Amino acid sequence: MATLLSGALVLAWPIAAQQPGPLPPPPAGSTPPPVVAPRKDVAPRVAQRDASSEISTAPPKVPVEQIIQQFAAREEEFRKERDHYTYTQTFSIQTIDENGMPDGEYRMTSDILFTPDGKRFEKVTDAPAPTLQRISLSQQDLDDLEHVQPFVLTTTELPKYNVAYVGHQQLDELGTYIFDVAPKTIEKNQRYFQGRVWVEDRDLEIVKTDGKAVPDIKKKGSENVFPRFETFRENIEGHYWFPTYTRSNDTLHFSTGDVAIRMMVRYANYKRFGVTIKLGTATEVKPDKP
């Protein structure tokens, strides 16, 4: 099941069964629907997309290593908790021509649901015929959607990375610590995140990521190139910072030429699945004597 965009793209060798012409792009400046449902005593908190202040390089009051361990532990918690939620996911990718207009698109909307016995599955609700001509999605795309994102630096993954403190920055109403993240080594057939994370300075939780999946994969006859992307999170039910929006506007550099792309993933309607019912101890009830 695909869960969030990472962005592996393959230069398209001839693609069959494509329909001519691009599909309509989403409205300019469109934003995901509100999905925040915080506690009544907590004001909604959102990692804003564009409002930010200058970065202060003064050392934090809390030891850096303590911050890192704390936000990694919270990432692990968020990853596990999100597996208990249903939500709607909309994913689109467009190629952009030299005039800045879309000339091909892949789009899919799906609901992430559960069977009655609690097994998670993805139900596609809308998937127009793709019109991409210059690139295509690869299996690595789908794998990265699930494994590289949305939670980039859990306790389990932390030993694989170098994490460096950058400074403190205000993202609208959120104070955040910034860290640069890079894999210590690149192991064969392993995928990693490389980029920057913003950690909310009160509860020490990641609220924004900016980077890419690495490494790019170039073999004879194919090139998987990964764009840079930003992922923004919102506070869900007053407890969890879940991803709600990912975007990318990048140029992919292939050996045969550059391809400009625009990608977007929206997550909406987060709802926790399941109801806990407590059952008492069974007792024998004897029938009344006649």
Question: Where are these predicted regions, by residue range?
Answer:
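Structured extracytoplasmic
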Residues: 19-194, 201-208, 212-227, 235-238, ...
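Sec-dependent N-terminal signal peptides
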Residues: 1-19
